Regions:
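Active-site-adjacent loops and short helices of periplasmic peptidoglycan-processing enzymes
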Residues: 22-181, 191
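Intrinsically disordered, low-complexity regions enriched in small/polar residues
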Residues: 7, 22, 33, 39, ...
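Non-catalytic cell-wall polysaccharide-engagement segments
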Residues: 2, 148, 152, 223
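Alpha-helical structural motif
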Residues: 13-14, 145, 192, 219
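Bacterial N-terminal signal peptides
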Residues: 12-22
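Bacterial N-terminal signal peptides that target proteins for export
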Residues: 2-14
């Protein structure tokens, strides 16, 4: 099932309309358009129908990382190591990251949000999760991070949402679930964060990682068709 996410800003007062299209096949659409500052719903269809959340998961991943970095005083220049097991995730990996590569949190965020990079998402979750892990009762870094994603969802009133990983790829036994209405709540929260706004508004970015002390540079282009 294909999932698409659209955000656009219009008018002099920067009124943001957030539209979510989930399941583009006939008869299976779900969408909602919301004025982000007033909360007024402009239109909706099947907005409470639960659907696989797929790559929209990365919005929650980004916000948990940004909130954690702010609360912990962690610099986004801090270096993370790509964890073991990421080669099994599948899907987008535009930088060709492999376990052991080193990348800053900032560069990983760019690759995740602009290039829908699943390995970058897992790397961010692993790095932040190791800090969160100390108060999570023995969970793995990824599991501790996903717990925070679901805590964020509950805090935003996303009652029909369940995240199962940091990247949105379906697992063999589970998949993340949400609704257009719930994702609107998350997107409004994200777009009110200046850091998140800055990342997603970039059209192209040259980013770097390190492998065996050799710098590897890439241009990551925004996969959002409206940018």
């Amino acid at each position: 099932m294909e999932v698409r996410f659209k955000i656009s800003n219009f008018s002099k007062c920067l009124l943001a309309v957030l539209c979510f299209l989930i399941g583009i096949t006939e008869g299976r659409e779900s969408y909602i358009a919301v004025e982000s500052y007033s909360g007024k719903i402009v239109l909706e269809l099947n907005a409470d129908k639960r659907r696989p959340v797929a790559s929209l998961t990365k919005i929650a991943t980004a916000m948990v990382v940004l909130d954690w970095a702010k609360l912990s005083g962690t610099s986004m220049a801090e270096i993370a190591i790509v964890p073991q097991g990421t080669s099994l995730i599948g899907g987008f990996n535009p930088m060709g990251l492999i376990p052991g590569d080193r990348i800053s949190l900032r560069e990983a965020m760019y690759s995740m949000l602009l290039g829908s990079d699943n390995v970058a998402a897992a790397t961010l979750a692993d790095h932040a999760g190791r800090s969160i892990q100390s108060r999570s009762g023995g969970l793995s870094p990824e599991a501790a991070f996903v717990t925070e994603m679901n805590n964020l969802a509950r805090g935003l009133g996303m009652q029909q949402t369940r995240f199962v990983n940091s990247h949105g790829m379906d697992g063999s036994r589970s998949q993340g679930i949400s609704t257009a209405r719930d994702m609107a709540r998350l997107a409004i929260y994200a777009m009110r964060n200046p850091g998140f706004q800055f990342y997603v508004k970039q059209t192209v970015r040259t980013i770097s990682s390190f492998r065996f002390n050799q710098k590897r540079s890439f241009k990551v282009r925004n996969t959002h068709a409206m940018i």
